[in-house]
């Protein structure tokens, strides 16, 4: 709970600045890249979140990271602030909250679409179009593959789930036959 409120506070502050400067989308993308980079490197995560490392050591790494990702000054300053306050461990939650605020601001929703096999571009676009009609918003797909579905897709938009998987259809048929 505390982590969520702290992350929300930082994300809202940065988001307000992004709106003011008209940089919501670029900052959202660069923050997501930053998050993926940090999460993808256990060593980097260790250095950034472990208070054993001095402030100067963390700051030097953050400077190199910001330069490598070509972060604009405000997102980079967020990193420095988090480092100075030993809160770099909150980065993932801050980025997720910022991304949610950005999506809401830009009138879009994210849908998690799970399929039995990888979706090609046209199938993914068709699903996104149908979900856009249902939600009256632009839909961005986060795709996953789960062979256990056997066929079809499961789409989740917020708390709403559309389950068109073969696995669920077979389970429904099995239940009906048992009655």
UniProtKB/Swiss-Prot annotation:
Transmembrane segments: none annotated. It is found in: Cell inner membrane. It is a peripheral membrane protein. Signal peptide: none annotated. GO terms for cellular component: plasma membrane; proton-transporting ATP synthase complex. InterPro entries: ATP_synth_OSCP/delta_N_sf (IPR026015), ATPase_OSCP/dsu (IPR000711). GO terms for molecular function: proton-transporting ATP synthase activity, rotational mechanism. It comes from the Bacteria. Keywords: ATP synthesis, Cell inner membrane, Cell membrane, CF(1), Hydrogen ion transport, Ion transport, Membrane, Transport. Its main location: membrane. PANTHER family: ATP SYNTHASE DELTA CHAIN. F-type ATPases have 2 components, F(1) - the catalytic core - and F(0) - the membrane proton channel. F(1) has five subunits: alpha(3), beta(3), gamma(1), delta(1), epsilon(1). F(0) has three main subunits: a(1), b(2) and c(10-14). The alpha and beta chains form an alternating ring which encloses part of the gamma chain. F(1) is attached to F(0) by a central stalk formed by the gamma and epsilon chains, while a peripheral stalk is formed by the delta and b chains. This is ATP synthase subunit delta.
